[in-house]
Amino acid sequence: MVALSHLGSALQLGSLWGFPRSPFRLLGKRSLPEGVANGIEVYSTKINSKVTSRFAHNVVTTRVVNHADTAKEVSFDVELPKTAFITNFTLTIDGVIYPGNVKEKEVAKKQYEKAVSQGKTAGLVKASGRKLEKFTVSVNVAAGSKVTFELTYEELLKRHKGKYEMYLKVQPKQLVKHFEIEVDIFEPQGISMLDAEASFITNDLLGSALTKSFSGKKGHVSFKPSLDQQRPCPTCTDSLLNGDFTITYDVNRESPGNVQIVNGYFVHFFAPQGLPVVPKNVAFVIDISGSMAGRKLEQTKEALLRILEDMKKEDYLNFILFSGDVSTWKEHLVQATPENLQEARTFVKSMEDKGMTNINDGLLRGISMLNKAREEHRVPERSTSIVIMLTDGDANVGESRPEKIQENVRNAIGGKFPLYNLGFGNNLNYNFLENMALENHGFARRIYEDSDADLQLQGFYEEVANPLLTGVEVEYPENAILDLTQNTYQHFYDGSEIVVAGRLVDEDMNSFKADVKGHGATNDLTFTEEVDMKEMEKALQERDYIFGNYIERLWAYLTIEQLLEKRKNAHGEEKENLTARALDLSLKYHFVTPLTSMVVTKPEDNEDERAIADKPGEDAEASYQPPQNPYYYVDGDPHFIIQVPEKDDALCFNIDEAPGTVLRLIQDPVTGLTVNGQIIGDKRGSPDSKTKKTYFGKLGIANAQMDFQVEVTTEKVTLWNRAVQSTFSWLDTVTVMQDGLSMMINRKNMVVSFGDGVTFVVVLHQVWKKHPVHRDFLGFYVVDSHRMSAQTHGLLGQFFQPFDFKVSDIRPGSDPTKPDATLLVKNHQLIVTRGSQKDYRKDASIGTKVVRWFVYNNGEGLIDGVHTDYIVPNLF
């Protein structure tokens, strides 16, 4: 579910940073253009979704213009599925693109608060609440500015009652000139049904605004209401787009399972059909304390009466009621015969609220009843037991410590059957209910206090009403897979689906086999799925229709989700390890999870960047002002700048080599990243190095692991991505995004990021074309290197790890403005001179002065070895 309540245009206007808030209404503002309020116009909102094998990649784009003559703050609250992870958030301000970076939560929060305190345009995307239900972005929009917000999120669509459901919350609350939802679905198994509907408009009124179709493996849904179709009446200026837009579909199932393999990762879907239902033994543990009085208890009764209608004759049940004490309908479980069900209805109708809340004793009574029924053979041998508890508050009598109740319940169940906890309303410790359910192989649901609470309760029961298998184990060939997600389940319920993903040890295997074992209603079953790898390639040959390495991302998504669940009940070292693994994957795959946040700030305003690398202009005596964090760049003749934050100072050296020479700037054997630069000379033909200026005219950035190369020259940027070539001009404003990579060109500035922790900036320096001596050249900045390994080397890379130096004996030099000194570094004693360079990262024309100590003789004594050790034969 993505609520466009604010991302779509229900904007809360004013300014967080000094401007008064002024909420607006469209009604009655006839003098304003349609869709404009308080000077802000949301003129476009689009949702583009690509679903590949249940994995949905969704991009929400909203375009806003501030017509006012003062800055305005725009706040967006975006409702998403609780299981979705945001993967990217991009601001485009007046045509300039600023991407988000996923960071550890506290790091992102500090960076955002610093930007806001300085009055800078900044947006923070963070998980809010228990289950990632809401993401908030606030941005200060300058007068006359256009801002585009692009939010990307991914989720695995879960099968629910026989259908996959994509749920979009649509609430623009004003007319939007261009509003559209486009959904493309690709399912290798073939699509068996596809539907779409909106809660805010009847199917008759949807008319031409909605189109839906499916054939074979592909499905498509489009919703594009015109301005007239958005109005509740012909003269209205508000919008009727306010509610749910739901897409449902299912796939063909020629066999119970389906395995798909792409680039060494696999996903296994399992959903058998036509099996007999396993009889179930249900202990309903119901809170009837005083707080349940009135509508809550009445809705609970209505739901239980409906559930009794669905009970099968083979099922067994009992009701355990708890308040200050515990009472039961029967002494033990009874079969769901017509006579017993009628008696149960009478009992449910008679339930009355009273007293306190004794969760511990209520649960233990229900669990004991199930255990005893099994021990005394009162229930069928091939049956399964379930505890369903409903409460609206916290324990306040008897054992009331949550951790002790959890321990008691865990010991009593002993892993034999699941516990499902239903939390009614908001006045309860939901985390406690959720954690207790998760560690007992169940889950928790919040039942919202609303008119449909009884339907919510009944809907939950329908999910678990028909177990088809128990004790499910998914097995693969020994030593053939790595990093497997959860592959054992206590139950498989009708209408659901089991999803397992992992990594293949050998990508070149010819076939792949998967076995699923489980206990059915009448016998034990084994389902075998064998995959021919060549046939698999044919089935997935329509790769243009799907996005990227979707199975790898699906695997990462599932792994993170399951690590976070395990983490909730872990302690000490185990919890630390689970947290570290989940955080590492969240950062690697750019997922916003409870451990991470995403922050966007204008790069030229952001002073939090860890490191920077640039190459200034022809003035060798430019200057340098070191920031507080490590800073590296290469510039000029070329000049290399190395900042050491521990010293609040910087070092500089030149490399004098002939035009055409290629130098190794960065090489990291662990991440596969390399950066090389080729030297060019000025326009003079003289080979005299004392007078001839040299610069970097060409850069090669490559990542062997990602099969990615980019060649940057003063004329163009050429990208090779898995053998696909793309060429861009420096005049282009373009962004390229793929798993783990973003590349943005904005006139004389290019930003290349490899996930979180590695970011480079290339600056184009242009001179007058008819200048008799100078020519265009490039500057290279390292703005973040903290994710590069300790084995990184190169003329710049060797300094990414901390090192120490000492400056002493400062004395007058040949130039009174540039003192000399003695530098002790790496066991070498060197003569250095104070000078300055320029950082052109913020302004390619003027630059910013930064002071440094200059090391002579091509950096000898400062760099490892000699400078000729860094000469390489070519860019790649």
UniProtKB/Swiss-Prot annotation:
It comes from the Eukaryota. The keyword Zinc does not apply. Its main location: secreted. Residues 281-464 form the VWFA domain. It holds the Pfam family ITI_HC_C. GO terms for cellular component: extracellular region. May act as a carrier of hyaluronan in serum or as a binding protein between hyaluronan and other matrix protein, including those on cell surfaces in tissues to regulate the localization, synthesis and degradation of hyaluronan which are essential to cells undergoing biological processes. Belongs to the ITIH family. PANTHER family: INTER-ALPHA-TRYPSIN INHIBITOR HEAVY CHAIN FAMILY MEMBER, INTER-ALPHA-TRYPSIN INHIBITOR HEAVY CHAIN H3. This is Inter-alpha-trypsin inhibitor heavy chain H3. It comes from Pongo abelii. The lineage of its organism: Eukaryota, Metazoa, Chordata, Craniata, Vertebrata.
